[in-house]
Amino acid sequence: MVRSSHRFRSSSKEVIAGPVTWTPFLVWDGRVNESSVDIAATAPVRKHVPMTSSFALAGANVLVAGATGGLGSRFVGQLVAAGAHVTAVGRDHGRLEALDLPAGQTLALDLRLPNACVAAVDAAAGRGPLDLVVNATGVVAFGTVADVTIDTMEELFLTNVFVPIMLSQSALPHMAPGSAIVNISGVIAEQNLPGMATYGASKAALRSFQEGFAREARRQKVRVLDTRPPHTETGLASRAIQGTAPNFAQGLDPDTVVSIILQAVTDGAKDLGSAAFASDR
């Protein structure tokens, strides 16, 4: 077990702040500390718009996690422009307000809390079955394996692996046949690099999870789409939780990356590797 400053609780304890002893095999109880979230008490129930290979985003009920980030905010913008009904989840109150969504469509929540993914899904599913879930959460770290701390490793896997798994687990019962769940593992999941080994391992773990989960979810006719765009100019590299980014070549335009991913969603794609973004470098 390792020491962590994150918030967790077992099935018999309240959420607590500050250093706690944590093990990855903690029981996730799925409950919510009501003081930590602000969800609209009522929401109009909408008719499900089934996803097909010719699915239109207009009218879709969509949950975007990590909505205040470089990619997440652009997902929200493009989805709203396409006529989707978006519930945006993020940790930054100010950036959520800047998305300029109607009341009840934003939720300030830290999805690293084991019960938070349930709250996020419940908020969006209150309007009807989910057509699309986009997970744009993620953190990055740089440094050799010898230098990366245990706390950094824990944060990488908590945010980049545990959150997508918990969000997928929470969302699946609320998704009707034909819907889709999108995660972003990135090109690093295809080939790891020195100085990014632990970060790359977390993203490879996410990709591996999706390979298995996709086969389970398709029994319910829910599509799981792994996307692996190359380096994109979102500013994430400058906000590393440890280390300093190397001198990357100019990355992809984030609006273009989001557009390609959403096109893949509407086209019924089941995988979106780095090669799909190559022409947009």
Q: Model-found features: residue ranges?
A:
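C-terminal helical subdomain
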Residues: 219, 226-227, 242-281
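Conserved glycine-rich cofactor-binding loop
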Residues: 68-69
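Substrate-binding pocket helix/loop in short-chain dehydrogenase/reductase
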Residues: 144-145, 152-154
